[in-house]
């Protein structure tokens, strides 16, 4: 039997995140040499990563990080295969570390984030791959949002009490209003608007909605003379449903979100809603 101590096993577990039996086996095969055991476990872990590539990662968590002065914020989704891993401390620590890295480096997009160095000589992609190996599940990082402005608010929603947040919303206002920011963010979490305003809806989407409205109206046998007005009404209904500013406000359905903002003298600059797996 190789010559090593319980302290060596503990050290190896801390260095690699591997289980106790795997660490003992690696030390046996490495004749008690911790460095060689680390290398062997990492090679084994990378083989496991390759095997997990074809698996689906639809569970996970959304994490957030807001600056103390609330002028900047990060929202990040990290996915895994099971809710068991998602609610574990190790997985959530990885997610929070990644969010802190985004806050510190402000990557332009997901490609830039994955290619950036989170530690000396280690990219974010390599860091995620290590988490994949250590946690024994496919771990995926492919989405984040980062806002900087006059005031940034966040709302995190748990769909199950024993799981980490599955929905996160980031909002940017042109002035500080914590209560309004929270209310708007909660509304976004619940109603999932696709766009901020009419102006943000792509022209091709509007045209597609208009064509559907025309075909539906004709199929209903409506008079041709009434067609333009009916179609316009249906397109306006689409805008009301799909745009945040057009939706009835969740906390006061008699007012639109735009009306609530106008009454508060606040402009909502942008928002981001992330739901795990969607």
Curated annotation (Swiss-Prot):
It comes from the Bacteria. Gene3D superfamilies: 1.10.286.20, DNA helicase RuvA subunit, C-terminal domain (1.10.8.10), Elongation factor Ts, dimerisation domain (3.30.479.20). GO terms for molecular function: translation elongation factor activity. One of its GO terms (cellular component) is cytoplasm. Signal peptide: none annotated. Coiled coil: none annotated. Keywords: Cytoplasm, Elongation factor, Protein biosynthesis. PROSITE patterns: EF_TS_1, EF_TS_2. InterPro entries: EF-Ts_dimer_sf (IPR036402), Transl_elong_EFTs/EF1B (IPR001816), Transl_elong_EFTs/EF1B_dimer (IPR014039), Transl_elong_Ts_CS (IPR018101), UBA-like_sf (IPR009060). It is found in: Cytoplasm. Residues 82-85 are annotated as: Involved in Mg(2+) ion dislocation from EF-Tu. Its main location: cytoplasm. Belongs to the EF-Ts family. PANTHER family: ELONGATION FACTOR TS, ELONGATION FACTOR TS, MITOCHONDRIAL. Associates with the EF-Tu.GDP complex and induces the exchange of GDP to GTP. It remains bound to the aminoacyl-tRNA.EF-Tu.GTP complex up to the GTP hydrolysis stage on the ribosome. This is Elongation factor Ts. It comes from Streptomyces griseus subsp. griseus (strain JCM 4626 / CBS 651.72 / NBRC 13350 / KCC S-0626 / ISP 5235). The gene is tsf.
């Amino acid at each position: 039997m190789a010559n090593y101590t319980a302290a060596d096993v503990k050290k190896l577990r801390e260095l690699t995140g591997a289980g106790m039996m795997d660490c003992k086996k690696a030390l046996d095969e490495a004749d008690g040499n911790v460095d060689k055991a680390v290398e062997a476990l990492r090679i084994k872990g990378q083989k496991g990563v390759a095997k997990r590539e074809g698996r689906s990662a639809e569970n996970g968590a959304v994490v957030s990080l807001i600056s103390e002065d609330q002028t900047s914020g990060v929202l990040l989704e990290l996915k895994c295969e099971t809710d068991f891993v998602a609610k574990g401390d190790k997985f959530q620590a990885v997610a929070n570390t990644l969010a802190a890295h985004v806050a510190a480096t402000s990557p332009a997009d997901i490609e830039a984030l994955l290619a950036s160095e989170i530690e000396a000589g280690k990219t974010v992609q390599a860091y995620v791959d290590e988490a994949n190996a250590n946690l024994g599940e496919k771990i995926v990082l492919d989405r984040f949002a980062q806002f900087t402005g006059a005031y940034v608010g966040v709302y995190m929603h748990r769909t199950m009490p024993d799981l980490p947040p599955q929905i996160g919303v980031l909002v940017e206002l042109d002035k500080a209003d914590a209560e309004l920011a929270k209310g708007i963010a909660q509304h976004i979490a619940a109603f999932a608007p696709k766009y901020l305003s009419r102006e943000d809806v792509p022209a091709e989407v509007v045209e597609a909605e208009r064509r559907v409205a025309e075909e539906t109206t004709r199929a209903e046998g409506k008079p041709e003379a009434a067609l333009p007005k009916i179609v316009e009404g249906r397109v306006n209904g689409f805008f009301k449903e799909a745009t945040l500013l057009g939706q009835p406000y969740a906390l006061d359905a008699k007012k639109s979100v735009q009306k609530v903002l106008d009454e508060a003298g606040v402009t909502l600059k942008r928002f981001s809603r992330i739901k795990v797996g969607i």
